[in-house]
Amino acid sequence: MGLRHLVLCPGSRSGPLALAAGGMARTNRLRLSTAIDERSAAFLALGFSTATGTAAAVVTTSGTAVANLLPAAVEADRSCQPLLLLTADRPYRLKDCGANQTVNQETFLSPACRWIGQGPREGLHLFSKETLESFAEKAWQRAHHPAGAVHLNLPFEEPLHLSEEEQRMIWKGWSPKIPRSSPIKPINLAMAAEGTNGVTDQAPFALDPLRPGVVIAGAWRGLSKDLFAFQQSLREWQALSGWPVLADPLSALPSDQPGLIRSWELLLATGLLGSQEQLQVLRLGPMSASRSLEAWLKSFGDGQLLITEGDSRCLDPLGLSVQWNHGLTSWWQHHHHRWIDADAASQQATKALLRKWQISDRFAQEWLDQQLPLQGAITEPALARWLSRLLPTELPIMLAASSPVRDWLAYADKSLFSRRCFSFRGASGIDGTLSLSMGLAMALGPTLLVSGDLALLHDSNGWLLAHPQRPPLVVVLIDNGGGGIFEQLLVKTAPSEAFEQLFAMPQEVDPLALAGAHNIPHRQVACLEDLPAALEWGLFQAGPVLIRVCTHRRQDSSMRQQLREGLMMHLQSISQNGHIDL
């Protein structure tokens, strides 16, 4: 069917699946990883799926092992990434009678899955070879159209463990055929949603490239195979319209995308470019983590166009858009013939709009370079600015949810778009941050993870995945003594001591000692000047490494506010001197 990577968790009831996976791995038909923590295993597989656009699989035994798959299933559902969850189960005769390790696991994952495939109640051995092939084919298609998690719950009757000779006989006779049936019709995710506000399958909504507008590119939620066509369609639309492109670091747009504006989040936060002129809005994918953007979009009212890459659920929390779910490439194919001879980008109003954004962006980037030099104490804004510059071109980056992804949105420079960036912007959790990054590194090669201390500690079992595969992952740990994101969310309803206890929750754990306990090479960086050498050291290692930097979350929170206010005054001064018309 196309399965290339499987993560196996320990268990007895799943013994037949383990033996089959081992046999396929020995004949190089499958890449096999092992993990003792099912939650970590599922995120490892999800990382591989996210990197390749093709589903990886997880195998678990019965019982609570299945419940641990739910966080990854939720993230796969919301980020639209394929994932196969194979769980062994007891036969039906052992259900609801107090049998050991027997629960109603067939229902555990259903809210987050594209499809639940239930094997024969008395045991998978009752499936014929043809039925099993059809069952597997359907699961594979459901995991990819539209992409998400599929759960196969597979009862096994004893005996569970065959001899090696019996296993060989099975493997010799196993020769899966190319899928015979026509593709399964994709399910409509919106049918299961609580509402379909603004979602349409009618003729796609048309924008007018002869009038000014703006493109808002959120996180990419399509499959890897569709990315180039998406990028090319946007390039052609921008060449026609001349609109500025406000892109999220997770948008998967290249650094040479015409009209790309890097500092848009900070510029919107100043309020100087948030004019009330009526602009058309083309939104691609989900909303970025920016309240300034939300407020700005609200000022334009309804009639905005939101295009998703196959996700038919409503993705507009603002309720202002018409939503087209069949992808930018499909939308562009519907409309490009209308404007073959148009020269919309030469329209004076559009040219003035793009020029204002580009000049403001250039001044903002130059000002940030002055404010965030590569020297002195380490701050989170400075890390976001410099890490991408110091890394090899095209090296992928995984950004933990909460502070890192927001800082890179605001402070990273244009070099960020020379590489793919990943993050949890589906369900926006911190589950599995390290484990998913391990999966990315296994699939893509050298990769960098930027994580806070709580996110890394929450998934510390991910360090167990370092051996024996040794994925080339450099982990930059921002240790600010707790949940730094809450300093930014203006939680001021509690005194300082209560804030630390109820929100920040600092942990008394030495992350370097924890890494050392897992035989992970580690290093502490004391100042920004030492960062280049530390990154060079980390990338030179053969497997995962930890680079720890310590920051002060309260001071960094104040610094972010000072940067926003300072940029506003800087741009106002430039405008008064006639260098830019705001």
From Swiss-Prot:
GO biological process: menaquinone biosynthetic process; phylloquinone biosynthetic process
Pathway: Quinol/quinone metabolism; 1,4-dihydroxy-2-naphthoate biosynthesis; 1,4-dihydroxy-2-naphthoate from chorismate: step 2/7; Cofactor biosynthesis; phylloquinone biosynthesis
SUPFAM superfamilies: Thiamin diphosphate-binding fold (THDP-binding)
Record key words, sorted: Magnesium, Manganese, Metal-binding, Thiamine pyrophosphate, Transferase
Catalysed transformations (reactions): isochorismate + 2-oxoglutarate + H(+) = 5-enolpyruvoyl-6-hydroxy-2-succinyl-cyclohex-3-ene-1-carboxylate + CO2
EC number: 2.2.1.9
Record has Cell membrane as a keyword: no
GO MF, one annotated term: thiamine pyrophosphate binding
Superkingdom of this protein's organism: Bacteria
Transferase found in the keyword field: yes
Cofactor(s) required for function per UniProt: Mg(2+); Mn(2+); thiamine diphosphate
CDD domains attached to this UniProt entry: TPP_PYR_MenD, TPP_SHCHC_synthase
Textual note on the cofactor: Binds 1 thiamine pyrophosphate per subunit.
InterPro entries according to UniProt: MenaQ_synth_MenD, THDP-binding, Thiamin_PyroP_enz_TPP-bd_dom, TPP_enzyme_TPP-bd
Similarity comment: family membership: Belongs to the TPP enzyme family. MenD subfamily.
Function: Catalyzes the thiamine diphosphate-dependent decarboxylation of 2-oxoglutarate and the subsequent addition of the resulting succinic semialdehyde-thiamine pyrophosphate anion to isochorismate to yield 2-succinyl-5-enolpyruvyl-6-hydroxy-3-cyclohexene-1-carboxylate (SEPHCHC).
Stored PANTHER family: 2-SUCCINYL-5-ENOLPYRUVYL-6-HYDROXY-3-CYCLOHEXENE-1-CARBOXYLATE SYNTHASE, PROTEIN PHYLLO, CHLOROPLASTIC
Subunit structure: Homodimer.
Protein name per UniProt: 2-succinyl-5-enolpyruvyl-6-hydroxy-3-cyclohexene-1-carboxylate synthase
Species name: Prochlorococcus marinus (strain MIT 9313)
Gene: menD
